[in-house]
Structures are given as structure tokens and as C-alpha cells.
Amino acid sequence: MARKHIFIGCGGAGSKTVALIKMKVYESLQNVSGNRSKVDVMNDNYRFMFIDTDAGDIDNLNEKFRTKYENGRVKMLSTNELINLGTQNPYVIYQKAKAAQEIQINKRIIEACDDEVAMHMDNRALKFGAGAFRLKSRTAFARLADQFCEKLVKNIQDLNKIEDNAADNNTVCYWVVCSSLGGTGS
């Protein structure tokens, strides 16, 4: 039975922790030979996902590991692994949800965030973070939940496609790393 792993980092603290785990897994791979890179070998058993609002934090992590990860040829945190909540404007999302309350996800947004709370949201995208305001990132995540699900399903399918292991024999372990005090990760 093959054990496969999907690590999901939520918010700044979660993303930093999962990035460190990814680097440890990468560095632990020894004696990689043939035409496969360490990343190829790592991808046989591991997938990593990052959910964050602060693009600067993601850029800083890529810069921190730039010389250690594939000698800088590829970014350590790729766009395929990132759910970028920083592109979303929670204030606008809430207003659109109020205008179309018959849609299920909009009902959930309105249930989670009442008018009084929504009035305190800035009318801007979250590219500089959620500012420890949990409902900002949760509202943004609601809009990108389908994208998250698609990436998660693709990761599961890719891990089960590895030819030397039958999918029936794989056990996929999910590791979600987040914080309890911030905005996006809590």
C-alpha cells in the first residue's frame, strides 16, 4: 500500500509551514537518477496547496528558497499550487451575494457575514492580506471554493495515476495547516 500526502497551507502561517515541509521533503530526496528531477520524484507521493491573500508573502517564500529549490529554475510555490484569495474583493462579493440570494453559496456568505460586519470591510482586493479579519478571507474563499475543489481533485487523481502503484492500494493522507489567530488561516 502506497501512502500519498497532500499538504494544504491556509493563510500566512499555514503557507509558511507547508513551504518548510515541502522544502524538507525535497531536501530528503537522495540519489535521484535518470532524467527525473527531485521534483518529479517528490510528485510521486506528495502534493502541496497554498491558500493565501498576501501575494507578498508568497513572493517572499519563493525568494527565500529560490537558490535551494531546483537551483532557481522553477518557483517553489507554483501558481498551480496556489489559491490566490488576494485577487478577491470581499466587499463586492458580499454586495453581489445580497443581490442574488437565491444562489446557495450566496446564502452561506450572507449567513456568515451580516450587514454590520460587511460595512467594516474595505472596498478593495485582499492582495495585502486579510488583516486578521476572518470574514474577509472566508468570503473570498467562498468565491474560489470551486477552484480549490478542482485543484484538490486533480491532486488526488494525479497521485493515483502513478503507474507503479494501483490506485486501489493508495492511501491519501491530508494535512491541513492553519493558524487560530490570523485572518486567512483561522
Predicted feature residues:
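Segments that form or flank anion-binding pockets
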Residues: M1-C178, S186
